[in-house]
């Protein structure tokens, strides 16, 4: 295990090391950035301007400029994830706010359970305790349940002219809709809720006709298919697909508190699990992403998992978490998928960011650039900014650079949420609240 730390003798944490700033925009908060050619595509966290997606010309990285903005046509949804392949862009459509939507789905069962227990209708205080929410949020949950939600899915866009994107279709799925996903020129690998399942599963769609995505196959964690008679061995949606990434004839599926799975899709109509590993609850934060290192290291096949630092919901919870392991990067030997072995970890010390204990801000890992060359990983670390990590020794990953954006728009701390690279080696960062940065690793 390695830990990034400047040490007390070096004083306050420096904001950058071997990474230099090139360009910046005070862009609305975002969930994902993807780069294709001379354009960056940004999927937004819910915002007052109702932005769904922004397209940015990055031909001159020192002077990026917005060429198109797509606003949401549905106030009950958000569209914070985006991918591009060729002239096709896909964005997610997911219930907003997600947490309220999930509690709305649970409300009828909670009411029935409490009514049977007490012989009367439950109070808001009882419902709040049962649903794990604040009492003043129960009314919002009740209203959301009364409205229902039928807009979940994904939208396909023609971006052959990036300054003039054209919607092709809104393909609806089920439940609260689609979260993160992967795609290429032929298929979309969608993480979505579907009728009859608990939590997100993988649904693969053929994009031969972008106006009519056609389902090819499904994959899920055993126990999710409740309509098929399966029974989950966990509470709620704790074991579910976060998203799955395609590498060759495999899908690498991050399964939240269920760890990760490796799926053989040589026959894409029949996905087949060939390996799985769950390192929770030893590590308390859920698995956000899993990917294989593109080359063997020391003759072994290596995979990298990155966990997502969960959001503390109160000052008391923030205090209670002190001393708990933050979300981190983990390495695994996956040479034999049937016998996966943990190898190493990489952590960032709270000493390495002046914003690590900013009230209300997250500090810990979230996401990495999901396509890597060589052994360098670029990871988003919330108030720890960007961390550049070399995994050449998977037993002891080491930090080789970092960049912590200065907070903007009056925010007390950066919340670096997502990172992508272009074919020039430039690095693109988005912040959950405000900020789009272009930086370069100089190491």
Language-model segment annotations:
Residues 128:
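The alpha-helix within a helix-turn-helix
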Residues 1-109, 116, 140-443:
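Feature marking well-ordered beta-strand scaffolds used for ligand recognition
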Residues 136:
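Key DNA-contact positions within bacterial/archaeal DNA-binding proteins
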Residues 124:
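Helix-turn-helix DNA-binding elements, focusing on the entry/boundary residues of the two helices
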